[in-house]
């Protein structure tokens, strides 16, 4: 039984889907004006792991993750680069797909883009105005937060506690608002900016409305899970809830999940602090699976500190798991012990997707395998566990070919043909295969 820590209730809750055996989840994707950094990648990897575990347990997952392809930052970066916002966003969408593929992130069921939903956004805003939850002011449209009965409950705040500009975005039109906390649903166009015609004149969507529209258009008025980074809890997800529930009168999401930050020297990794490393740059020297494994070593809600040592440790541990998978199969293994490993793994992951505990089980199982318990069922169970973490090794050299060469080497040694035996060892070494001569015979490892 999977239990999820729900940010809205600040409690661990049993997962009950809206539709049996199906999970509909929406995860906020990147604003595509630059390469993603390791902190951004944490969200992609964390929710991909969550998706994979749902699939491991038999669920069908509809996984939606958007691209914000029009935004103040995109407009600014495009202007500086001398290209259109679409050209810039297309470039970094392609980069995001390439980077996350290297991290073993499965393609989303759908990746909606804001520019493809302008008509639906306008219709959504019109509905909010009709219901008196929104108002037009000089070409802008704002949401009335005071009409939202439980505004900011997700962030465990009250209206009186909130400060103007909590989102960190410049609010030059405060004088136009009925309440300084009201947020933009539609922004009037500035000279030279990309814009679309609307009942309120030319303009473009506000940031928060975009995800509400794409999520409900694709998954319906109520979804099972909405996820994203902890920094989106307020104001982004708070505002999504307010406008979505104002329009539909229904609960927007049944479970809210937020991943913790990647830190550097215990400070949040961010572009504003200048302490970030892009995935694109890291992949020049570090294998994508190593980065992914590093990000999985902590439970998704907890912060994880980025250090060279942590990356090095991930590389060593990943190599150990790879070598474990490549052990020769044995004829027997304790089926009851295998069952206990599977149960322990599921218990760990059922507890709010605790990857740290899940990985501990994986290493305990690897130790058991290396002690001589590696039948086909054991291998299958082990591979399925690793796949939850996105760890899938490609076979560079087929086992049957390796075993055939080892047999030839053994025959050469028996005939005291050491030149041939050494040549076979060198041939295997060139293919990344290391031979270990033991009293029980020859073992081999991928280097």
Curated annotation (Swiss-Prot):
List ligand-binding residues for Zn(2+).
28, 211, 236, 240
**Co-factor(s):** Zn(2+)
Cofactor: binding comment? Binds 1 zinc ion per subunit.
Q: Where in the cell is it found?
A: Cytoplasm
Q: Which family does it belong to?
A: Belongs to the class-I aminoacyl-tRNA synthetase family.
Q: Which residues bind ATP?
A: 271
- Where does the source fall among the domains of life? Bacteria
Chain ranges for the short sequence motif 'HIGH' region as given in the UniProt record? 30-40
What organism does the record attribute this protein to? Answer: Streptococcus pyogenes serotype M3 (strain ATCC BAA-595 / MGAS315)
Which GO terms fall under molecular function for this chain's record?
ATP binding; cysteine-tRNA ligase activity; zinc ion binding
Which processes are annotated in GO (biological process)? cysteinyl-tRNA aminoacylation
Main location per the UniProt record: cytoplasm
- What reactions does this protein catalyze? tRNA(Cys) + L-cysteine + ATP = L-cysteinyl-tRNA(Cys) + AMP + diphosphate
Q: Which UniProt keywords apply?
A: Aminoacyl-tRNA synthetase, ATP-binding, Cytoplasm, Ligase, Metal-binding, Nucleotide-binding, Protein biosynthesis, Zinc
- Designated name of the protein: Cysteine--tRNA ligase
The record's gene field reads cysS
State the top-level EC class: ligase
Where does the UniProt annotation place the signal sequence?
Answer: none
PANTHER family with a match to the protein in the record: CYSTEINE--TRNA LIGASE, CYTOPLASMIC (PTHR10890:SF3), CYSTEINYL-TRNA SYNTHETASE (PTHR10890)
EC code(s) of this entry: 6.1.1.16
The listed location of motif 'KMSKS' region is: 268-272
GO CC aspect terms: cytosol
Q: How does it assemble?
A: Monomer.
Xref: InterPro entries:
Cys-tRNA-ligase, Cys-tRNA-synt_Ia_DALR, Cys-tRNA/MSH_ligase, CysS_C, Rossmann-like_a/b/a_fold, tRNA-synt_1_cat_dom, tRNAsynth_Ia_anticodon-bd
């Amino acid at each position: 039984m999977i239990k999820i820590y729900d940010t809205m209730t600040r409690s661990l809750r049993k997962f009950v889907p809206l539709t049996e055996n199906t999970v509909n989840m929406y995860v906020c994707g990147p604003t595509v004006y630059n390469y993603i950094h390791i902190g951004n990648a944490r969200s992609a990897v964390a929710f991909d792991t969550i998706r994979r575990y749902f699939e491991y347990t038999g669920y069908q997952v509809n996984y939606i993750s958007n691209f914000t392809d029009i935004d103040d930052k995109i407009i600014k970066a495009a202007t500086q680069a001398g290209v259109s916002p679409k050209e810039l966003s297309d470039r970094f969408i392609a980069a995001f797909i390439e980077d996350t593929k290297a991290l073993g992130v499965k393609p989303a069921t759908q990746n909606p883009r804001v520019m493809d939903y302008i008509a639906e956004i306008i219709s959504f805003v019109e509905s909010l105005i009709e219901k008196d939850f929104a108002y037009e002011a000089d070409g802008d449209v704002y949401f009335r937060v005071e009409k939202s009965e439980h505004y900011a409950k997700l962030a465990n705040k009250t209206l009186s506690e909130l400060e103007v500009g909590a989102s960190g975005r410049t609010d030059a039109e405060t004088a136009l608002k009925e309440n300084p906390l009201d947020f933009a649903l539609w922004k009037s166009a500035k000279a030279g900016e990309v814009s679309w015609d609307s009942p309120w004149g030319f303009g473009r969507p506000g940031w928060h409305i975009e995800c509400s529209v794409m999520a409900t258009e694709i998954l319906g008025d109520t979804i099972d899970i909405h996820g994203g980074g902890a920094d989106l809890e307020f104001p982004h997800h708070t505002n999504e809830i307010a406008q979505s529930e104002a329009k539909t009168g229904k609960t927007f999401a049944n479970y809210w999940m937020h991943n913790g930050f990647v830190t550097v020297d215990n400070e949040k990794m961010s572009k504003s602090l200048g302490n970030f490393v892009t995935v694109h740059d890291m992949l020049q020297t570090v294998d994508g699976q190593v980065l992914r494994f590093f990000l999985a070593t902590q439970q998704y809600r907890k912060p994880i500190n980025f250090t060279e040592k942590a990356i090095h440790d991930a590389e060593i541990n990943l190599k150990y798991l790879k070598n474990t998978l490549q052990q020769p199969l044995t004829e027997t293994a304790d089926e009851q012990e295998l069952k206990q490993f599977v149960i322990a793994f599921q218990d760990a992951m059922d507890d709010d997707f605790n990857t740290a505990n899940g990985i501990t089980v994986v290493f305990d199982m690897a130790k058991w395998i290396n002690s001589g318990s590696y039948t086909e069922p054991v291998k299958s169970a082990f591979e399925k566990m690793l796949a939850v973490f996105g760890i899938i090794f490609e076979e560079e050299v087929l086992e049957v070919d390796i075993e055939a060469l080892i047999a030839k080497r053994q025959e050469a040694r028996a005939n005291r043909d050491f030149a041939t035996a050494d040549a076979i060892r060198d041939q295997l070494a060139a293919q990344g295969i290391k031979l270990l001569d033991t009293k029980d015979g020859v073992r081999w490892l991928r280097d």
